Amino acid sequence: MNAVPLRQSEPMPQGERVVTILGATGSIGQSTADLVRRGRGRYRVEALTAHSNVAELAKLARELGARFAAVAKEECYAELKAALAGSGIEVGAGESALVEAALRPANWVMAAMSGAAGLKPAMAAAGRGEIVALANKECLVCAGEAFMRHAAANNATVLPVDSEHNAIFQSLGAGRREDLVRIILTASGGPFRTATREQIENATVEQALKHPNWSMGRKITIDSATMFNKALEIIEAFHLFELKADQIDVLVHPQSIIHGLVEFADRSVVAQMGAPDMRTPIAHCLGWPHRIDGPATQLDLAKLTQLTFEAPDPVRFPALRLVREALVAGGAAPTVLNAANEVAVASFLDRKIPFGGIARLVEATLEALVAKGTAKAPQSADEALAVDHTARKTAAALLPEIALKAS
């Protein structure tokens, strides 16, 4: 049984929607908070969490009337407690407090904590059997099989926040699941869409951080430039929608207007369109199964001069080849790919390896660990974190070799 609903018509729960935002001070969390503000009277905020931005967390908690606020860094506890003194808001710190926030009585949880730290809280939220708006990639990339099984077993509803997966989710409502042929994820192509292999190999940090369409953090902007973001999205779609690897295609769409397409047996292709603005999929998830007013710019089709598509080049962008190989290998290979990529991106941003070295380090780590039999799929958050740790250590050990080959 899939935890992602196949139809859009389930009734809205009666009364106000009780909301928890895990990762409230990040871009996704802030956008969610803004939508909650706009819908005053329809939402009540139960809990908010942050990594270490105590000032912003305290401000949001007071403004939104949260009942509980938690910070990941335990050393920030005293600061948060002081910032919320006299407010009546309960305060916590550390991993256990993040899990407590996820377990609080909310019927809609935004899981937007970044990185592996968001895995256990998201698992906890799914275990409550309510709606989880999933923005944390690690849940699906590192522990997709375990997470979706856990969500389904507890009758949780998982709504994809990522723009491409949200587009697929919306488009799937146009037909029956058994009539689905394939899905198509779109990619902007990033800053190096038309660059040569040599230009890509030697790209600078500054060049890689110039995304043509989206305003994002440094890590995801580099992932867009390498197309590892699309590789990770393939893994996410594989688990979210219970697809076979050959049912997931990618098209480069430079305008970033069409976010995802679904093809059915009668050869109808249904697509979701919108301005490149993450507030649209967030609003869709917050209002689901209904629609709420969103703040994104209205799409003016008359002003669009063209919508173009290109097949991606797996030679210039080996991430797309590596993710296919990881899915074929199965087990923990996707977890290894994600961890190695994080080490590689951090090393590139620190100017320790060239841009082309990112994919080479990921491939070398996959070869080292999958060959050693580290291929059992994680069955829990702890197992996923253990594989993640091993892969990071392996990637770090291989780093000097990758750097040496580039010199």
Swiss-Prot record:
Keywords: Isoprene biosynthesis, Manganese, Metal-binding, NADP, Oxidoreductase. GO terms for biological process: isopentenyl diphosphate biosynthetic process, methylerythritol 4-phosphate pathway involved in terpenoid biosynthetic process. This is 1-deoxy-D-xylulose 5-phosphate reductoisomerase. Catalyzes the NADPH-dependent rearrangement and reduction of 1-deoxy-D-xylulose-5-phosphate (DXP) to 2-C-methyl-D-erythritol 4-phosphate (MEP). Its EC number is 1.1.1.267. Its cofactor is Mg(2+); Mn(2+). GO terms for molecular function: 1-deoxy-D-xylulose-5-phosphate reductoisomerase activity; manganese ion binding; NADPH binding. 1-deoxy-D-xylulose 5-phosphate binds at K137, S163, E164, S188, H211, S224, N229, K230, E233. Pathway: Isoprenoid biosynthesis; isopentenyl diphosphate biosynthesis via DXP pathway; isopentenyl diphosphate from 1-deoxy-D-xylulose 5-phosphate: step 1/6. SUPFAM superfamilies: 1-deoxy-D-xylulose-5-phosphate reductoisomerase, C-terminal domain (SSF69055), Glyceraldehyde-3-phosphate dehydrogenase-like, C-terminal domain (SSF55347), NAD(P)-binding Rossmann-fold domains (SSF51735). Belongs to the DXR family. It comes from Afipia carboxidovorans (strain ATCC 49405 / DSM 1227 / KCTC 32145 / OM5). Mn(2+) binds at D162, E164, E233.
